[in-house]
């Protein structure tokens, strides 16, 4: 179960990273609902650039996760705790520095994904 869950995380992270890199607006408006069209051209371009840079960070992490699954399976628990903490803590930062949007973006479920991943982490260390 843990192994297949790890593959789901890799797929999700690859998809998310590529969306931020290659989507015209980096997913900022089309997915997250940030009203780029109401911002100046320069401000919107800066936000899109930040999303693309974040996408490359996610892509690097995804490549490491893939390497762990393929070559270093004994590190899957470490991978799970890193992904869990990243999602949970990003959700915490979102409470402290929240986005002002009409609707919650899909990333709002990030803490839930983090908690599920944390549960799978505990399963993974119990199995070892």
Question: What positions do the PLM features span?
Answer:
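Hydrophobic alpha-helical membrane segments
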Residues: 77-95
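Membrane-water interface at the C-terminal end of transmembrane alpha helices
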Residues: 115-128
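N-terminal signal-anchor transmembrane alpha helix
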Residues: 1-23
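Non-cytosolic membrane-interface motifs at loop->transmembrane helix junctions
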Residues: 32-34, 100-112
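Core segments of alpha-helical transmembrane spans in multipass integral membrane proteins
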Residues: 31-66
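Juxtamembrane helix-break-helix junctions at the cytosolic face
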Residues: 62-77
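Membrane-helix interface motif
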Residues: 21-31, 84
């Amino acid at each position: 179960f843990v192994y297949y869950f790890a593959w789901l995380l890799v797929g999700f992270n690859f998809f998310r990273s590529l969306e931020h890199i290659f989507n015209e607006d980096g997913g900022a408006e089309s997915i997250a609902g940030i009203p780029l069209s109401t911002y100046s051209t320069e401000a919107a371009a800066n936000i899109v650039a930040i999303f693309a840079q974040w996408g490359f960070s996610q892509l690097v992490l995804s490549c490491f996760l893939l390497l762990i699954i393929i070559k270093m399976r004994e590190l899957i628990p470490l991978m799970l705790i890193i992904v869990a903490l990243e999602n949970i803590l990003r959700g915490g930062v979102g409470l402290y520095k929240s986005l002002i949007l009409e609707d919650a973006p899909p990333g709002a479920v990030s803490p839930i994904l983090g908690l599920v991943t944390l549960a799978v982490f505990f399963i993974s260390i119990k199995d070892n």
